[in-house]
Amino acid sequence: MENRVSLGSIQKAVWDGRLPLEIVLASSESRTFDKTDPYLISYPRISYLPSLLPKLRAFFSNFLIDPNSQSHDGWFEFEGVPLKWHYPVGLLFDLYAGVDPASKTAARDNESPGDGSSLPWRLIVHFSDWPPDLVRLDAYGMVMNDAFINSVKEADFLRNGTAKGIMSLSKEDSSGLWNAVQEVDLLSFQRISNILLPQPSQPFRNVPIRVFLPLLPDAESSSLKVVQTPLPPSIPASSMQSSQILTSRSGSTLQPQTVGTVLHTLLPNLFPSRRTPVLAKPVLHGAVIPMSAPIEEVVRSSAYGDGWAYIVVRMMG
């Protein structure tokens, strides 16, 4: 019971997490060039940037050179990189802005490294010249909804070995899951997501986890490098404390798969140790997660709304 309470409190903290955003209209699309006031908001980490577009379109409407542009024409840019709208904003921040401040130029406005200069996160919104490598949005939000549900299906298949759970949801619950994420309604989300999750006494078939490799500061390409493979929540036991040893149906002894064993398996050169970060550290929701944390518990408590734990690898030193 204590474990359930603990996991529940972590999930609540994840859903309560917010990022301060400062969004400006692209100067090339503004009647006043770069003189428009920024749009400031404290935005939930689990939310998606396109949900802001109607408010942004209204906020900047008097300054747009093209008055016929629509909110679903909008897209976001950070330091020249178009942001992938199907990723939650918290993940995007961890990928592009949540880096070691010492590796950034010290000085926007003569700020020194380490003083929190990456916040608020400064983004540029465009309402024209849609990037060719981004899927276009539609006026009714169906493209966003479909992308989210498809991601939920993938996670459901990994957890259960089948996507029957999400496929058998009523239309009301299926749309309700996406609405709960948009509205940051954790109670409504839990009611529906608990239908899809195996009971705590029943382990996942595989854990839905994606690991994002570090972005090179001067890389010519903005494409993300993602590592993903089916990973069971338990592995053959080694030298573990007896309290951590499990027994499989076949009688073999197992131990919980941890963040450390996952990263050592996927990226042994970056994570030569299963217990201690040496060259890189794993970041989820802006925090470094312990290498000893059981990966299934991490997913149950800290997955984004689509059921995936998105771990960002950040280099040390």
UniProtKB/Swiss-Prot annotation:
Instruction: Specify the protein's topology with respect to the membrane.
Output: Peripheral membrane protein
Cellular compartments annotated = Preautophagosomal structure membrane
Lineage, top-rank taxon, reads: Eukaryota
Post-translational modification as stated in the protein's UniProt record: Conjugated to atg12; which is essential for autophagy.
GO BP annotation list: autophagy of mitochondrion; cellular response to nitrogen starvation; piecemeal microautophagy of the nucleus; protein transport
Main location as per UniProt? membrane
Specify the cross-link site (Glycyl lysine isopeptide (Lys-Gly) (interchain with G-Cter in atg12)): 153
GO MF annotations, alphabetized: Atg8-family ligase activity
Coiled-coil region(s): none
Keyword list (alphabetical) reads:
Autophagy, Isopeptide bond, Membrane, Protein transport, Transport, Ubl conjugation
Q: Name one GO cellular component term.
A: phagophore assembly site membrane
> Could you give the subunit structure recorded for this chain?
Conjugated with atg12.
Q: Cross-referenced PANTHER family, in alphabetical order? A: AUTOPHAGY PROTEIN 5
Q: What does the record give as the function of this protein?
A: Involved in cytoplasm to vacuole transport (Cvt) and autophagic vesicle formation. Autophagy is essential for maintenance of amino acid levels and protein synthesis under nitrogen starvation. Required for selective autophagic degradation of the nucleus (nucleophagy). Also required for mitophagy, which eliminates defective or superfluous mitochondria in order to fulfill cellular energy requirements and prevent excess ROS production.
Q: Which family does it belong to?
A: Belongs to the ATG5 family.
- Under what name is this protein listed? Autophagy protein 5
Its source organism is Penicillium rubens (strain ATCC 28089 / DSM 1075 / NRRL 1951 / Wisconsin 54-1255)
Organism placement in taxonomy:
Eukaryota, Fungi, Dikarya, Ascomycota, Pezizomycotina
